[in-house]
């Protein structure tokens, strides 16, 4: 399973709303678009049109990850996920695992501490250790659902990323490139600094020599 950024956002929103606002679930296209474009609890913040959301929904429908539902006497089509924990889903997740996967789909890479703090509406973890235990279970499957990222400078905890979407693989390839670019930039700066200093010293030596010559000429003319 490899979801695009928009597909991952749609699935994440459906998972979230099923738990946090069950009375409004399934979601209409308009409600789903509003959920995808929330300014809070989303990273990155998107501004998707209903057309873009519909394209993602249609693609997920073809992948059998979404189903349509029409109420009796209503023309409004609503959507529900078939991502996990349904009779049609191969994937079955515990409430704790579902909360972690949902948060990673909606907000990208996060630390165990961040996941615990942000999961209170989805699942109540008693402490960070419980989050870490659940993460280990998700990583220890035959086909892991999560991956640990290299710890960043200044961070006490490593971040974890879900492996359901293309965004996670792009992040993996982007990080080494970014790191190598930074190292190269520092190396160039360090190499460039002595060269600039040497050039400046040469210019000053030349100016001193010219001034010395003019001073000698002035003394000679006065004697």
UniProtKB/Swiss-Prot annotation:
Superkingdom of this protein's organism: Bacteria
One Pfam family, short name: DUF480
UniProt cross-references to InterPro entries, sorted A to Z: DUF480, WH-like_DNA-bd_sf, WH_DNA-bd_sf
Family: Belongs to the UPF0502 family.
PANTHER family: UPF0502 PROTEIN YCEH (PTHR38768:SF1)
UniProt protein name: UPF0502 protein Sbal195_1802
Organism: Shewanella baltica (strain OS195)
């Amino acid at each position: 399973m490899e979801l695009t950024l928009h597909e991952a956002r749609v699935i994440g929103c459906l998972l979230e709303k099923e738990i946090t606002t069950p009375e409004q679930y399934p979601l209409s296209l308009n409600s789903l678009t509003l959920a995808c474009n929330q300014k809070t609890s989303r990273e990155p913040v998107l501004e998707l049109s209903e057309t873009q959301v519909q394209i993602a929904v249609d693609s997920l429908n073809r992948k059998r990850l979404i189903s349509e539902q029409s109420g009796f006497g209503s023309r409004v089509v609503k959507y529900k996920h078939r991502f996990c924990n349904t009779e049609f889903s191969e994937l079955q997740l515990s409430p704790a695992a579902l909360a972690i996967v949902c948060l990673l789909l909606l907000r990208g890479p996060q630390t165990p501490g961040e996941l615990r703090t942000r999961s209170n509406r989805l699942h109540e973890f008693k402490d960070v250790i419980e989050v870490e235990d659940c993460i280990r279970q998700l990583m220890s499957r035959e086909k892991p659902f999560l991956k640990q990222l290299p710890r960043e400078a200044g961070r006490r905890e490593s971040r974890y990323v879900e492996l359901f979407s293309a965004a996670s693989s792009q992040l993996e390839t982007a990080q080494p490139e970014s790191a190598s670019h930074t190292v190269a930039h520092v190396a160039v700066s360090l190499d460039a600094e002595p060269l600039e200093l040497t050039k400046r010293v040469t210019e000053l030596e030349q100016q001193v020599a010219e001034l010395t010559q003019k001073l000698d000429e002035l003394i000679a003319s006065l004697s």
